[in-house]
Structure formats: C-alpha cells, structure tokens
Amino acid sequence: MGKSSEAWCIVLFSVFASFSAEPTMHGEILSPNYPQAYPNEMEKTWDIEVPEGFGVRLYFTHLDMELSENCEYDSVQIISGGVEEGRLCGQRTSKNANSPIVEEFQIPYNKLQVIFRSDFSNEERFTGFAAYYAAIDVNECTDFTDVPCSHFCNNFIGGYFCSCPPEYFLHDDMRNCGVNCSGNVFTALIGEISSPNYPNPYPENSRCEYQILLEEGFQVVVTIQREDFDVEPADSQGNCQDSLLFAAKNRQFGPFCGNGFPGPLTIETHSNTLDIVFQTDLTEQKKGWKLRYHGDPIPCPKEITANSVWAPEKAKYVFKDVVKISCVDGFEAVEGNVGSTFFYSTCQSNGQWSNSRLRCQPVDCGIPEPIQNGKVDDPENTLFGSVIHYSCEEPYYYMEHAEHGGEYRCAANGSWVNDELGIELPKCVPVCGVPTEPFRIQQRIFGGFPAKIQSFPWQVFFEFPRAGGALIGEHWVLTAAHVVEGNSDPSMYVGSTSVRMENLANVQKLTTDRVIIHPGWKPGDDLSTRTNFDNDIALVRLKDPVKMGPTVSPICLPGTSSEYEPSEGDLGLISGWGRTERRNIVIQLRGAKLPVTSLEKCRQVKEENPKARADDYVFTSNMICAGEKGVDSCQGDSGGAFALPVPNVRDPKFYVAGLVSWGKKCGTYGIYTKVKNYKDWILQTMQENSVPSQD
C-alpha cells in the first residue's frame, strides 16, 4: 500500500531516544510499546556492551515491521565498530520449528548498537520486534582476520594470550615474539658471529645487538663472504626493512641488506670496539648472515723523526713494537737540558709513538769558550757543522802551534774540534823579543842616553832594592840571584819609562808567587865583599799573568845552537835605571849598546872596592864580559837583560844572552850571567812550577 502525500501535512509526534547501560552478560531489547503497535516517526538507540573478552550474540524472537525496499521506511539496524552488521524490516518467522529465533547475529566484539527507526505513518498496525542478547566467548585466535599473535595464540573464555617458541621472548606489547640476541660481548682476538638460527630463517621483529671489545691497540677487522649474507631486500625506495649495521666510534658501515653482501668484504674499523646491530621487521625472514672478525694490531707511522736510524728496521710497525731510534752523526734528541744520541719509542694503543715529542735535531756545540789573549769570531750559528775561527791579539800574542790553525768545527759529539788539536783550545802566547820601537842610539848606559820602555818592553823594575829583571813569560821574570836573595816578595813593575810613583801607579804591578834561586848560587855573602857571582840567576813566578802590549812584552830565551853562543864583538842592548856618572838615582829609563868582549878584559879591570882583592874574584864559563871604556852598566841595573839579536831573523828580535851580574868598576867592563848555560834549568823549573798559586 503506497504512502499518501497528504500525510506529510499531519505531524502527530516525533521521538528520538538512546539507551546505554553498564556491561552485562545478557539482556532484552523490545521495540517501543511492544507488543502493541510502535509509534510513528520515532528513533531509538540501544548501546549494548558485554565484558571485555566476549562477543555479543543478538537474536530476534519476533519481527513485525513495515516492509520497504532496503528497509527504507521502518527498520531496526545493527552496528558494530562503525560497521553495519544488518538492517531488518518486514515480518519474519522461525525456520526451525523447535526454535523461536527468527533472526540471529554473532558479533566478535563486545560492543554494538541497535537502532530502531519508524517513519511518519504506517497504513497497517505493526507490533515491532523482540530481541535478546547474550555474552558469548570469542576465539580471538581464529575469529579475526588480523592474527593477534606473532607466533602462538591461546584462547580462553573471555580472552586470549600469546606465547612464543623456545629461545624467544614476548615483547611488551604482549603479542609479538622476539629473540634474546642482544648483550653478547666478544673479547677474543678472533671469532665468528651469525644471525639467530643461521642458516635457518632469522626471527622477525627482533633487534639483535652484539659488541666486539678488544684490547686497546688492536682494531677490529670484519670479513664477510657474499654468499654468507641473505637479508630481506630493500623496498622500492631503497630502504632496508631488515638490516645489518656496524658502528665503530665515529664511523658507521651500513645498513646492509639484500641477497649477497653489498658492502666491502673486509672492513677495517680503526677501532678496538665495534657495535653490530641486526634489526628485522614482521615480514619475510631470510637465512641471515655469518661473519668472521679478528684483531689487527693498530699500526704506527714508520717515521716520527727525520735524521734518524731505526732498529729493528721493519716494513710495518704495529701496537707494542719497540724501536731504538738513533740520531745520525751530528744530531741528538734533547729533553730538557739533556741530550742523547738515541732513545726508545713504543707503538701505543692509539696508533701514536711514545716519545714522539723528541726530535733528532742538530747538535748544538754552544757558545765557544773564550781564550786568554785572543778572540773567537761570532759564528752565524753553533750547530753541527758550523765553523769558528780563533785568533790572537796581534802583534803582542801569537797562536802556539799556529800550523794547526785556529779553525774549529762543531763536531757530532757536541764539541768544537780542531783537526789537529781536537777539543784542546788554542793558546795565545806572548810574542817575545820584539820591541815596539827600535833602540837606535848608540850610547853608553853609564851616563847614557834616555830610552823609551817601548824599546825595552821586557824591562822589569825592582823597586827595593833598586834593580832590574827580564820578563820571559806571562808568569815569569828572570833576574840575578843576588837581586832577590833574602827577598821573597820583591815589588816589581812593568810598562813604564819613568819610575816616579805617580807613573808607576798607572802601570802593571807584578805580584810575586814564588822566588826560585839557582841551586848553584852560593848564598849568604855580603855583596860588598862577595867575589863569587857564579850561577847568579833566579826566577820569580808571578801570581797573575802579565798582560802584554806595546810597553810590555817578554824577551826570548836563547836557543841551543852554537849561533846563540855570544862572540867577541857582538853588540847587545842593555837598559835600566842604574847609577850614572852624574846621578846616583835615575828616574827615566836609559839604554845603550855594548859589545861582547873576552873575560880577560874583565879580569884586568882595576878593583875599586877596598874590601875585596882582585885576585879573589871568580870567573867561570857561566859569565859573559861586555862593555868598553865608558860604556857599562852599574848599580841599579843588576838583573837586567843583556839582549842580543836573534840570529837569522830579518826583523829585529832579541833574546836574553846575559843578566847584569857584577863589575869591578862602573863605566868599564861588566860581567853578565850567561843565560844559554841555564836554558835547561829555566825550562825545567818553569815546567815543574807551571801552575801559579791562586791564593
């Protein structure tokens, strides 16, 4: 029967209702006014809920509603989880004579909605429906399209639980199983690691973490055969679903996936620790992977310093290797203030050498030592191979053994070395016998001509008693024995023409260290009565060295050849501050030239001393007679040098042939100690007493 359009104009009432209740195990749902006719234009909803873990069985025992296509007019609708499970209208009867149920629904969820709707008019009287619901057990393991458990599903009334095979564990979501494959630490220097169950399929939904931890100084090296790797391949975007990853400190290798290992077959990690992470998802498990690893000693660079030699020599040095590093000649390793020609170094766990701060650097010989009376050129540097030159203060000093030269080279042992002298420093010795100004005036000293000290730079002035001496070295004065007899500390000066006190204050005063009289000298006689002046010679050793210059320089000692034997007629020089024919006291230095004559001339001189007889005087081969009438030395000149020219020398140079000793009468012939006869004694005495006292 069709619907009248006029019926839309009469609206009796419209009811919308919704009912819900706490979860129950069963219940009844009846259409409004059941079993009477249900009202028009009404909508009513029942929210059915049974306890968790149960489904709902909904069945109708009576259904009498207006029939329409697709139940468009009146209907009862069943909805679960937003999905329509059914829509009913019309009349239904039981298909089973033994059961009153005309329609039945089993919902695997614990909630559903029942919605009753009626339109604005019914041309017949319809009584509606009667329905009942009850909680039913649901088999979650089989009743759902989505499997609730990754492995084993176990159903029970009101619920289910998941379980796992042996060696698996249940994740926190209580549904998925994984493998206990983390926490393994490998410390052996060689080993093998594989995925769980290899070569059988690895577990799904797992994260396996392994760690290789080797002793510091070794790096982990991993090797994999391509055929030993089969992991679920990457997706279309290139992302690995299952993956193998290596992480070593700040380096990462991977992730890797696919059939056949896609990475390098040998991985050098440069680290003693390696983390291995294997991660899988829920789909497509393959056979997995197998790898081998070993510890390779960390290498150290072959050269840590130039100019060195290593022992032992090897192509490669690795952790714990020890080498002796020897610097090549001329180089040394310096630490602090200490230098060494070698040191030891150990390859450390970090791939660095111990003692790497040390370097083989050129040996530094340091600032050259100064020398007395000389100087050394300032070198550009003082390192190995550098050359320096020593020189003496010319013209007053010369270099002893000059044939060896003054060149020194910085040697490998850190010393300045001369080719001939080795490490011995050159010695600057005074130039002897060379006056700054030649004495040109031929004049007798007795009442003679004034002279400059530059003409007799070897002249020594003895203050008391007034006498003379000859400087023969930096530490030695030669004089007559009778001058220093009884006087162990004579006062002496050098370098002054005048012996006024104000002049002496500005020149070098010599300090006596020791007086050594010739052992053949006969001591004790009074000079006024002495007639034996044999061996009248003495040495005075000085405490401090004499500084040579234009007014001070030594006279040479005689040589040993016959050329140094004074002969009659040889002209020699004498100087001093002795008495003249006019003055007993002389202030300015005077000098003269005297010829050598025979001892007989001296014997024939008439004796003026009333206390001595002429026949008592002793004449020996240790004496020289020199002078001529009116030209002689006198009191105050004793001990001074009688200087003869050095034979066979172009430039003027003098040696001490004699020392003023004695004479019978001033202004005539005088006796001089013959120095040549005492040459050996002089040298031996100087050698045996070569180190002056420093007191």
Swiss-Prot record:
Query: Superkingdom, according to UniProt?
Result: Eukaryota
Which residue positions does (3R)-3-hydroxyasparagine occur at? 155
- Where in the chain are disulfide-linked cysteines found? 71-89, 141-153, 149-162, 164-177, 181-208, 240-257, 300-347, 327-360, 365-410, 392-428, 602-625, 634-666
Question: Which InterPro entries does the record match to this protein?
Answer: CUB_dom, EGF-like_Ca-bd_dom, EGF_Ca-bd_CS, Pept_S1A_C1r/C1S/mannan-bd, Peptidase_S1_PA, Peptidase_S1_PA_chymotrypsin, Peptidase_S1A, Sperma_CUB_dom_sf
- UniProt domain EGF-like: residue ranges: 137-178
What subcellular compartments does it reside in? Secreted, Extracellular space, Extracellular matrix
As recorded in UniProt, its EC number(s) are 3.4.21.-
Q: Does the keyword Calcium apply?
A: yes
Q: Which residues form the CUB domain?
A: 22-136, 181-296
> One GO biological process from the UniProt record?
complement activation
SMART domains xrefs: CCP, CUB, EGF_CA, Tryp_SPc
Report the protein's function.
Answer: Capable of degrading extracellular matrix proteins. CASP degrades type I and IV collagen and fibronectin in the presence of calcium.
Q: What is this protein called?
A: Calcium-dependent serine proteinase
Q: Which organism is it from?
A: Mesocricetus auratus (Golden hamster)
